[in-house]
Amino acid sequence: MRAIYIISVIIVSLSIFSWGGNARSDYPWAMFALRLQWPAGFCEVNNACDTKSLLNTFTIHGLYPYNAKGTPALYCDGTAFDVNSVSDFLAEMHLAWPSHETNTEDIQFWEHEWKKHGRCSEALLKQTDYFRTALAFRKAFDIVGLLNQEGIYPNNDLYRPKMIKEAIKKHLNAVPEIDFTKNENSEYVLTDINVCVNQQATRFVDCPTDDATDDYRLKFVRLPSKMKFADPRTNSII
């Protein structure tokens, strides 16, 4: 019963950012995937990690249009990135969509994601709407909270990939996709989770999935906790 209640609450939250309308047959993209990044996982497998941005929450990696065959849209023609398009909600962008790479500023990261994926959605979502939608999409649910309710915590424990996916599916009524990378010890570390909605963003749908990520039957993926680093400004542990 609680799961049904949670799904209902999430659907209401989803409707807040839905652009609605009828599905457009002339529009090549059938769904959108919000790619969420786990900062501690990213930083464990990337040397050029900006430790200032480590948070115990998932941050936005990107918003990707997919066609009906499950192929993401890449590098379409369209307008150039304009930072003024996010000026009204710039502070929220820095918090929710930060770059975790030391050599990439937040604005550079947004520009890259717009060029790589965002422009492909421009017939439906103009630049400002694209970024607003990603922010609202992220706020429609709490991945960490949903996982915690199913006994999955970012505490460096090992979990089967299917267990993580089933935990999220229980609450969103749709299958997510997870991504993981090997660290220097050849352990699989969770770095990203995709959550998908239909073209009009009125309901969650199953994400395109790579069967290989489901069928690491003898493998486990580790969900790192927030790592501790010395803050050079205060020499204290953060």
From Swiss-Prot:
SUPFAM superfamilies: Ribonuclease Rh-like. The keyword Hydrolase does not apply. Gene3D superfamilies: Ribonuclease T2-like (3.90.730.10). GO terms for biological process: RNA catabolic process. Root. It holds the Pfam family Ribonuclease_T2. InterPro entries: Ribonuclease_T2_eukaryotic, RNase_T2-like, RNase_T2-like_sf, RNase_T2_His_AS_1, RNase_T2_His_AS_2. RNA binds at residues 37, 61, 109, 112-113, 116-117. GO terms for molecular function: nutrient reservoir activity; ribonuclease T2 activity; RNA binding. The active site is at residues 61, 113, 117. Keywords: Disulfide bond, Signal, Storage protein. The keyword Iron does not apply. Residues 1-23 form the signal peptide. Disulfide bonds join 43-49, 76-120, 196-207. May act as a storage protein providing a nitrogen source. Seems to have no RNase activity although it has conserved the active site residues. Homodimer. This is Ribonuclease-like storage protein. It comes from Panax ginseng. The lineage of its organism: Eukaryota, Viridiplantae, Streptophyta, Embryophyta, Tracheophyta.
